[in-house]
Amino acid sequence: MRWILFIGALIGSSICGQEKFFGDQVLRINVRNGDEISKLSQLVNSNNLKLNFWKSPSSFNRPVDVLVPSVSLQAFKSFLRSQGLEYAVTIEDLQALLDNEDDEMQHNEGQERSSNNFNYGAYHSLEAIYHEMDNIAADFPDLARRVKIGHSFENRPMYVLKFSTGKGVRRPAVWLNAGIHSREWISQATAIWTARKIVSDYQRDPAITSILEKMDIFLLPVANPDGYVYTQTQNRLWRKTRSRNPGSSCIGADPNRNWNASFAGKGASDNPCSEVYHGPHANSEVEVKSVVDFIQKHGNFKGFIDLHSYSQLLMYPYGYSVKKAPDAEELDKVARLAAKALASVSGTEYQVGPTCTTVYPASGSSIDWAYDNGIKFAFTFELRDTGTYGFLLPANQIIPTAEETWLGLKTIMEHVRDNLY
């Protein structure tokens, strides 16, 4: 711990409360052994350093990405060199990237106001996404319907689009989830593109047509509305919910550590200031509970797919344990077929495997809860990229990402269609 205190002394108290990103950099650190992983892991839990780990230390074959505030760059780089840790700068000036992103959004908003058309190749506000959900439902009233499933901590509505041919009540269904981690904007953007793709391709594409003839699709494009709004108004890199934690000034919980699946186990924290804080109890976050209640009341979901970013991964249970899921062989086969279909568009390569051994242990996750509650076909996509931009994927990659992801999603849903249980 001595070296942590040493860095803290060098940095001093000037970084306290820093929310700006001028001169902040993202470093990629290549770890080679368990000792190096251990040293970096201790830094993850050192609040005074104000480091933001985008990719946490977990294994030798997985680099560590960390956002370093400008005031701590010199000290942190000195520490890395002193420990013989190799690193490279992947983002030179984070604020410059954010400024470009903001300029693009404002430009797009102006164009959309004048044309009254939704640009699927741009990032949008929560209100714009909800408005487009209304448009989709209005354009295809016999196929799509917007359904309110609950509300957020700050009382924002949570909407899903239900796609159904209307033949039967509580038919077999697939749940598509996105935006549970608010800063992962490519997931929300991919989800709303996917919504339009479903209605546009019905009765044109035999695959999606046959899927909807046999089962329904429920799509939640923004699973963490408060966090998403906060990323656009206060802190672009906010990950958690915006709930209050009694006894702590730190806000929110990680909604993907809050599900009742080995809750409070490995890969989650009991520290409210941690980005992987699991919350006071399972389903404490109203956003999570709304989904849980809806799915349990419905009672006939066969698939659950959660869209995240970044790293280009396609994973399945378990995250909370290294033990193999009973259906691991089938899930792995389906995931590899989906990854192959995805790669056929532009060659984007995805790594496939169970969450725990592919990235890191993660208790309380959505897909583990789904799987443990009888939803056999449970998968997580970590979308583009592998670290060049990380969570700040440029808008010109939205449509290419969505197009390739669609083939992966469709492959999984076809398997669900053909293997209902």
From Swiss-Prot:
Name of the gene: CPA4
Main localization category: secreted
Protein name: Carboxypeptidase A4
Subunit relationships: Monomer. Interacts with LXN.
Pro-sequence residue ranges: 17-113
Cystine bridges: 250-273
Cross-referenced CDD domains: M14_CPA
Residues annotated as glycosylated: 260
pH influence on activity: Optimum pH is 8.5-9.
Domain Peptidase M14, residue spans: 122-416
Function per UniProt: Metalloprotease that cleaves hydrophobic C-terminal residues with a preference for -Phe, -Leu, -Ile, -Met, -Tyr and -Val. May function in peptide hormone and/or neuropeptide catabolism.
Positions of the catalytic residues: 382
Residue sites binding Zn(2+) per the record: 181, 184, 308
Leader peptide range in chain numbering: 1-16
Organism annotation: Homo sapiens (Human)
Cofactor(s) for this UniProt protein: Zn(2+)
SMART domains: Zn_pept (SM00631)
Zinc as UniProt keyword: yes
UniProt family annotation: Belongs to the peptidase M14 family.
EC number from the UniProt entry: 3.4.17.-
Keywords: Carboxypeptidase, Disulfide bond, Glycoprotein, Hydrolase, Metal-binding, Metalloprotease, Protease, Secreted, Signal, Zinc, Zymogen
GO cellular component terms attached to this protein's record: extracellular space
Compartments (UniProt record): Secreted
Class of enzymatic activity (EC top level): hydrolase
